[in-house]
């Protein structure tokens, strides 16, 4: 059922699939070659450079993309990149044609790509953000991502704290923002130590010409340096709860059993909002590091001291699920991140439709987005 053919075939096909237990989402998902995670994360359809740009990479991963077979006209760009000195890796469950063109071949069990990407991310965050922070990575996260933005932490009836939503200017009475304060996010500015309304959120898109951009300025045009972490400027450490789905049984892989809710400690600030209530807030960056189980010295459980710990997110944990040796995960993650650091981002991933042929395929793709 394709809408572009006729609404009759689309409607009847959708009805049939629903009756046999299928789940119909958006047309974006039907082809399974365009990842739904892209508009979920960025609000835009997949927008990538042309294949000729592979030549400019210095580390190239073909993940679920059998380039010689499914992208035959582009295959020569892949080979030419190798002649240019680019290191290549294939990640496919089978020894496909692309695996013959690469320096390394990783073969995770079908459907376990998210666990593999999660472990890659754990290594990258630990070594290039915590142990020896990369100035290039942290500056990139500060300017081009939502990682400095503040998130409200909601206390549940059982006493647990969970991430709720972004803190908005409207939560604090507008902070002088007359235009769409309910759509403007907040962060702390290292220059002043105060809350700032940084450019770039959707609240700037309409009504304020020239301000919908990611220049490192606040809404008044003052230069900012957004604070990524509250580690050195907080009102305390709080245990925040994160869901865990790796224990779900499946015939294709081994479940890694842990509690369905994992608590991890992160630094927080306490703010009194316009309604008089006090809320704890944390940065996206701190929440992300906690989600990946990276130990930052805040105490508490459910964090990994080393890569061999059987803790969600570690190379050892993913080995149980994917079957990929932990040593290979550590090596590829280090090389991928080190190359990106030294070349200012010239590590690339070619993602194929094989990543999208799964329910919850957006989780596969989000893991890769975080790596990049």
Question: Which residue stretches match the model-derived regions?
Answer:
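A glycine-rich, hydrophobic/aromatic-adjacent loop/helix-cap motif
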Residues: 310, 316, 328, 332-372
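Conserved short loop/turn motifs at secondary-structure junctions
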Residues: 1-5, 66, 316-321, 351-358
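A short helix->loop->beta-strand "cap" motif at the edges of active sites that frequently abuts
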Residues: 80-88
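Anionic-ligand anchoring segments at beta-strand to alpha-helix junctions in alpha/beta enzyme folds, i.e.
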Residues: 2-56
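Long, well-ordered, tryptophan-enriched scaffold segments
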Residues: 99-100, 104-342
